[in-house]
Amino acid sequence: MGNYTIKIAKGLENNSDAKIIRENVFIHEQGFENEFDDIDAAAVHCVVYDGGYPIATGRLYEKDGAAFLGRIAVLKAYRGKSIGSIIISELEKYAAENGFGECMLSAQCRVKGFYEKLGYTAFGDEYKDEYCPHIMMKKVLSKPA
């Protein structure tokens, strides 16, 4: 693993760096149109930096009393280096420390295996978000030490 810095902040504090990554990955690379939403203002954002440069992001938010992970994105040059796993681990830790017993997420079906390796289990039927097939997944969290 490289010498990365991780920043977690609630609300808009991390949004400018998170937006750079999300625009690059979800809009320019994957072609999504509706990337930003009202959830961003209240979500907890995790951003990973390499030498001060934002390279990956993810968010955690509460919906109907449950913790949801979302918008997990790693710049192409940094994929395959366990950075996505770092983001998820940090957000799961934050969720557990704040009383949540499980995390849920909406995964693009093409990366379902990545989440399964991290302990997530798919449930429900596949559905499309814009043009892309997705599946709901969940994981029971370990209690914080």
Predicted regions and their residues:
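A conserved beta-turn-beta hairpin within the catalytic core of GNAT-like acetyltransferases
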Residues: 62-70, 79-80, 129-134
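Conserved beta-strand in the GNAT
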Residues: 47, 53-61, 66-73
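Conserved N-terminal entry element of GNAT/NAT acetyltransferase domains
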Residues: 1-12, 142-145
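Conserved GNAT acetyl-CoA-binding A-motif
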Residues: 88, 95-108
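Conserved acetyl-CoA-binding loop-helix of GNAT-fold acetyltransferases
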Residues: 74, 80-93
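Active-site rim helix/loop that mediates acceptor-substrate recognition in acyltransferases
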Residues: 20-51, 55
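Conserved catalytic-core motifs of GNAT/GCN5-like acyltransferases
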Residues: 104-106, 116, 121-136
